[in-house]
Amino acid sequence: MATKKKTFVLYPSLGVGHLIPMVELAKRFLAHGHGAVIAVVDPPDADPLSAAAVSRLATANPAIAFRLLPAPASPDAAAHPVKRSDDTLRLANPVLRDFLLLQNSLPDALVLDMFCVDALDVAAELALPAYFFFPSAAGDLAVFFSLPYFYPALPASFREMGHELVRCPGMPPIRAVNMPLTVQDRDSDPAKVRLRQFKRIPEGAGVLVNTFDWLEPGALKALKDGVCVPGKPTPRVYCIGPMVSDGGKKQGHECLAWLDAQPKKSVVFLCFGSKGAFSALQLQEIARGLEGSGHRFLWAVRTPPEEQGQFPEPDLDRLLPEGFLERTKEKGMVVKSWVPQAEVVRHEAVGAFVTHCGWNSTLEAIMAGLPMLCWPLYAEQGLNKVFMVEEMRIGVEVAGYEQFVKAEELEAKVRLVMETEEGGKLRDRLAVAREKAVEAIQEGGSSEVALVEFIRDLENRNTSSENGACK
C-alpha cells in the first residue's frame, strides 16, 4: 500500500546554525513526496542576520513554506545566551500552538530541534506525534542522553576535572575538557538548561540523526541497547544522513577562481564556521605555521572577538605578520570573513581541511573525502574531535586547541597530512568513508531505508491513535 503524503512542521531553535540543517531535512521530506513547513521563532531581540538568512533560504527553496512566529523575548536580558534562548522558546509555546491550530489541518507530526523540548507540551496538548531532529553526531546524542543521570553524581564539574577521563555508558572514555563548553560548570545556568533539555529529548517519539550507520557503530549500539537512559525507554533513532548543503547556485566567489588555478589536492583549507574567530596573537601564529609548512592554503579570517564591535571586517595587513601576504601571495589566499565552504571542500584542488569540528563541516568533508585537522572551538566540537580522531580516524588533532596553538604544531600537522605515509592512510580512510556515505543516501542505502521506516512508523502510530490504541 502506498504511503499517504505527510505534512511536517519543522521547528528549529534560534539562530542560523539551527535553521540550515532543518532546511536540508525539509528537502529530504520533499524528495520523498511529503510537505514541509518550517516555523521560525522570531523574538524582538533576534539577530538581524537570522532574519536575512530566513529570507535567503526562503527564496532559494520556494517549495518549502517558511513561517515567522512572533514570540516574546526572554524577560532576563542580562542572562546567559543559553538561558535567554531557552526562555524565549518556552514563551513561544502559545504562539506555536495558535499557529498549528490556524492551519487547514494539523500536521502529521512536529519535528523539533534538540533545544525545543518545551514544544513537547504543545504536541501533547494537540495529540501530535513529536520527533526530534539531532543535527550532530550519534556519539553526541549518546553522551547527551546520559549526562543528566551520571553528571550530578560526579565529585566535581568537568572544568575542575580537566583531563580526567569521564566514562559515559556505552561510550569510550572521554576527557572532561572535551565535554561541551555549556556544561563545563555543573552549577551554572547554561549547564542547568542543557541538562534539563537533554533529559526531555527521550520523551519524543523518535530521533532523526544526521549521520549514517557505518560511521558510528559504537554509539548507535549504545543507543539501541538503551544503556544511555537508565531505567527509561530510549526512543528509536533513525540515521538519515549525511545531509549537507550543496552550496546552492554557483557563488562565483574569487576564491573558487583561485582554486581552479591550483594543482589537485595541493591546498590546505582553513575555515572555522560562522562563529570561529581567533585573537590577533593566534592569527599571527596560524600565519607563521602556514608559511613554515610551505604548502598552498586558502584561509578564511574573521575579526578577533575583542575587535568585532569596532571592526566588522578584519584588517589583514594589521592582524597578520608584516610582509606575510606579500611573501605568500604565490601560494596562499586569505579571504575576509566568509567563503562558500560547501563548494570549497568539494573542489579538486583542496587536499586538507583545518576545521572547528562542527558536525555539518565534518559531513561535508566526509562527502568530499577530505582529511581533517581538528581544532574544536565551542559547543559539542570537543566531543566531535574525540570521535573523529579516536573512533572514526578521519582526522588528526591540532594540539593546544584548548588555549593556544603554536605555529610549529600547525606546521607539523599540515606536513603530516600532506606529506607523510600516515597522511596517505588518513586519505585512504576518507575515501572509504565517502564511498559509504554515498551508499547510505542512495536508493536502498541505510539512510534512505531509515527515512522510509520513519514514515512507516509514523503512519502506524497515527493509525493506532485513530483506532484508539496506544503505541
Summary of predicted features, one role per range:
Residues 1-471:
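Glycosyltransferase specificity loop/lid
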